[in-house]
Design a protein with these regions (language model features):
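HotDog/MaoC-like acyl-thioester-processing domains
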Residues: 1-11, 64-143, 208-287
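Conserved mid-core segment of classical short-chain dehydrogenase/reductases
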Residues: 345, 371-388, 430
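C-terminal helical subdomain
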Residues: 261-262, 396, 454-455, 459-461, ...
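Conserved glycine-rich Rossmann-like NAD(P)H-binding loop of the short-chain dehydrogenase/reductase
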Residues: 309-324
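Hot-dog-fold acyl-thioester-processing enzymes
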Residues: 2-67, 115-205
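Catalytic Tyr-X3-Lys loop
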Residues: 381-400, 441
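Catalytic loop of short-chain dehydrogenase/reductase
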Residues: 274, 372, 415-440, 445-450, ...
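Conserved glycine-rich cofactor-binding loop
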Residues: 293-294
């Protein structure tokens, strides 16, 4: 019979820290906020195996039984602070199924099979081995070939492992320290060894040898062999086999599947210049581009600088990327000036206005490009608050710059661009918040065109671009390089044009 647990599963930062300490998996997607912000997820992702341990902890006690087999599908990313509903099916005495859901969207599916057993080792024993790696391996795609095999020796950190077992009350549920240690090993291997730094765990299936639950030497570490069975290069998917032993005796074996996330390719400076050209046509003009450190914003800033424009490029936290862009653009006829700040903060916008007037005396172009990270959501009770928060945040990141700076643009009879999306015409499922936000900022542009008739207001709707927003194994398929769209936009901005209430600009 299937039932929903009365309380949701919720992960806090301390849970991620405890898991990392126990497993030695310190992959930056899970632990570094700065790194995670540069991915499609926009923030730290909860370890998949941590989710599996939490799901096992919601089973009924299993007296006289021990975990024999476990399969887990990590169906979607999990995040800190979100309450995940727990659906448990224990209709079979030796099999249990658990789903973690964010509303209707399943983020984890787990099936556990048990065997009759006298006991499981409830607490880890022995000394921790030094972790083989303290930094995740970063293999190039060319090195990920079928037949690759890795071997090693592993031991979870005993005190942290004991704390994890207690945190989720696993021992009464037939999950002992050796079971948990094998799961932590799987997380470590995927996140730190293969594929390593770019890993996104997809699923696992493990069979546990009964003799390994109470080995003759409880202090013995796990010896492991990980073999890469197949690589699916289109999606960066790796299929792997894992075998472990304790003091020479088989312990756990199974299959692991993970994606090697593709890093975004560096923007092609040559391709951008070939598409947009180089001149001094915008010499003396000043532009402000929000969200300019990466992706489309960086390409727009680059294209403007190629024609002599002084570009103030804002960023929230990507200082290194902004400084690197400034260095790249130092050879252009224009200039790129990084400016840290939150585009949705009125105090920041007021200070930016004062700086613009004091240092430049004008603003000719305003490009409202910044937007929040995007998570999939449905229109349902579990998502309602996050939908409204996303829309409010998105609107602020356009409304605040327009409110504080548009009159400066109008004084120069310049242009203000609001970056929308083709999704407003063809809305994808799971993006109600994104589509609503883009429709709202388009409406702001229409009203702004009425309020400031001396400024040329433009709304652009890019197609799917290869930026962090879509850089997942499936999402990146058929995405276009942002520099090509940026080139088309800047070429159009350089053409003469009169203000109009027909603000949507079709760029093809």
């Amino acid at each position: 019979m299937t039932h929903e647990a009365p309380a949701p599963v919720r992960f806090e930062p301390a849970d991620l820290g405890l898991f990392a300490a126990a497993s030695h998996d310190v992959n930056p997607l899970h632990l570094s906020a700065a790194y995670a912000r540069r991915t499609a997820f926009g923030e730290r992702v909860v370890f998949g195996v941590l989710g599996a341990l939490a799901a096992l902890g919601r089973l009924s006690p299993q007296p006289g039984r021990s975990l024999a087999k476990l399969s887990v599908e990590f169906a979607g990313p999990m995040f800190e602070g979100v309450g995940y509903a727990v659906e448990v099916d224990e209709s079979s005495p030796l099999r249990a199924k658990v789903k973690l859901r964010d509303g209707r969207r399943v983020v984890l599916r787990l099936t556990a099979r048990f065997r009759d057993a006298a006991a499981v080792a409830a607490t880890p024993a022995g000394d921790a081995l030094p972790p083989p790696r303290t930094e995740a391996a970063d293999h190039p795609d060319a090195a990920l070939v079928a037949g690759l095999a890795l071997t090693g020796r592993y031991a979870a950190a005993p005190s942290a492992l004991a704390a994890l077992l207690a945190r989720f009350e696993l021992s009464p549920r037939g999950v002992g320290s050796r079971h948990a240690e094998a799961l932590l090993l799987a997380s470590y291997l995927v996140g730190m060894e293969l594929p390593g730094r770019r890993a996104l765990f997809s699923d696992l299936a493990l069979d546990f040898d009964a003799a390994s639950e109470l080995p003759p030497d409880p202090t013995a570490p796990l010896d492991w062999t990980l073999r890469l069975d197949a690589v699916h290069p289109d999606f960066g998917m790796l299929s792997m086999s894992l075998a472990t032993s304790i003091a020479g005796a088989p312990a756990a074996r199974g299959k692991l599947t993970a994606f090697a996330r593709h890093e975004l390719p560096a923007a092609s400076d040559d391709a951008l210049e070939a598409a947009v050209g180089r001149s001094e046509a915008l010499l003396g003009r000043v532009a402000l581009v929000t969200g300019a450190s990466r992706g489309l914003g960086a390409s727009i800033a680059h294209a403007l600088a190629l024609h002599g424009c002084t570009v103030i490029g804002t960023y929230l936290s990507s200082a290194a990327e902004a400084e690197a862009l400034a260095a790249r653009l130092s050879s252009t006829p224009g200039r790129f000036i990084p400016l840290q700040g939150d585009a949705g903060d009125p105090a920041w916008a007021a200070a930016t206005r004062a700086t613009l007037l004091a240092e430049h005396g004008r603003l000719d172009l305003l490009i409202c490009n910044a937007c929040p990270a995007l998570r999939p959501l449905w229109l349902e009770p579990a998502s309602a608050q996050r939908i409204t928060e996303h829309v409010a945040r998105s609107v602020a990141m356009v409304a605040v710059p327009l409110s504080h700076l548009l009159d400066l643009v109008a004084a120069q009879r310049g242009s203000a661009v609001v970056v929308s999306s083709s999704a407003v015409v063809d809305p994808p499922a799971e993006w109600p918040h994104y589509v609503a936000a883009k429709c709202a900022v388009e409406a702001l542009a229409r009203v702004a065109a009425v309020e400031q008739p001396e400024a040329r207001l433009l709304v652009v709707r890019p197609p799917k671009l290869l930026t962090e927003l879509v850089n997942t194994p499936m999402g990146r398929q058929d995405a276009l390089a942002p520099e090509h769209f940026a080139a088309r936009l800047v070429r159009r901005l350089m053409e003469p044009g009169e203000p109009s209430r027909d603000v949507v600009l079709e760029l093809g």
